[in-house]
Amino acid sequence: MKNRKLAVAGLLGAGLLLAACGTSGSGSSSAPPGAQGFTPPTLEPLGQLGQPEGALNVLAWPGYAENGANDPKVNWVTPFEQETGCKVNVKPFGTSDEAVNLMKTGDYDVVSASGDASLRLVASGDVEPVNTSLVPNYADVYGFLKNKPWNSVNNVSYGVPHGWGANLLTWRTDKVTPPPNSWSVMFDQNSPYKGKVIAYDSPIYIADAALYLQKHQPELGIKDPYALDDKQFKAAVDLLKQQRPLVNEYWSDYLKESQALKNGDGVVGTAWQVTVNLTKSEGAPVESVLPTEGATGWSDTWMVSAKSKHKTCAYKWMNHIISPKVNAQVAEYFGEAPGNAKACAETTDKKHCDTYHAGDAEFAKKISYWTTPIAQCLDGRTDVKCKDYGEWTRAWTEIKG
């Protein structure tokens, strides 16, 4: 639970290949599920499993591939090795940008990619489509996580959903009254909590501002907070510049945010459920809510390297990691909702899935999951260009000053 220690200020690099990839997609209702707006390289998924190759190189967020080294009681790698004969080498990474760069080396077979990295990996040809029929446990993954813009392109799956969560509005109950249910407490320039706001430190946070504007300035026409044309992007950036005097701290490590909430340096902010749980467990009076405007969030996907020399082991790993028992172990240790619907029966804390809204499709619908912004608008528009992540990164530098 205490292992999403992510220094994610530089979630994506400026060298975004997506802007140059293919043609723009259609916004019609007949458009296939998944991402639109670019054409990935033509790569074929694995046709059938062979003999396990005896090795597997795993690139993972800390806490996703535990072998007992950090905690002897937390180990789902060794059972996999014993079951398959695939010797696992784990390389943890700290940011999505780091993961993307490491995947380019071809040294890794599988990667746990967040939505802000997955499309880059697809567009560059560093990962290939996944034959989900070779992953039996895929059948039990929640339907609302399948064939989404961050893990599929034109109805072709590029990975196996693993876990997910929302970026929640969080506050100290002894300092913030009445209980807020809107992001306005963080964005309104007249907020009574000036100098006490905690905001996420990443260019992807521009999407949070866009989501707020989508509801509060509908005349901007924002349909997707990751698909912003010039006017929409300027409005989101201006809102974040207006917010800057309200902010006490920009956080990229949830432990530091928890500390700020505990000591009162910050009284309201955006946080993960694991942050709320930890802060509460250490005595601070905090609560959280998914606001009326909705929220941004993440859904992580296991993807297979196009250069992998151990593809049978890779597929066996994906099936293992989303099996009910293991998916439950990872979700509890990492601090997120599991992707496998049957995992909830396997959690040690029987309230875990309720706390994290694991099977709550309506809750999930309110989340705008991290996705890589590209020049071809992800909302299907073809008459304008949208701002790509390189421009988001430059704007974030200006916002923070």
Q: What does each model-found stretch correspond to?
A:
Residues 17-20:
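C-terminal motif of bacterial Sec signal peptides marking the signal peptidase cleavage site
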Residues 305-373:
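Mature extracytoplasmic/periplasmic domains
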Residues 168-175, 211-213, 298-311, 329-333:
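A bilobed periplasmic-binding-protein/Venus flytrap-type ligand-binding module shared by bacterial periplasmic
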Residues 117-120, 270-285:
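A ligand-binding cleft/hinge motif common to bilobed small-molecule-binding domains
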Residues 22, 36-120:
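Early extracytoplasmic/lumenal segment of secretory-pathway proteins
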Residues 366-401:
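Conserved C-terminal helix/tail region of periplasmic/extracytoplasmic solute-binding proteins
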Residues 56-73, 107, 112-260:
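Extracytoplasmic ligand-binding site segments that recognize negatively charged/polar headgroups
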Residues 137-140, 237-243, 282-306:
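Periplasmic-binding protein-like
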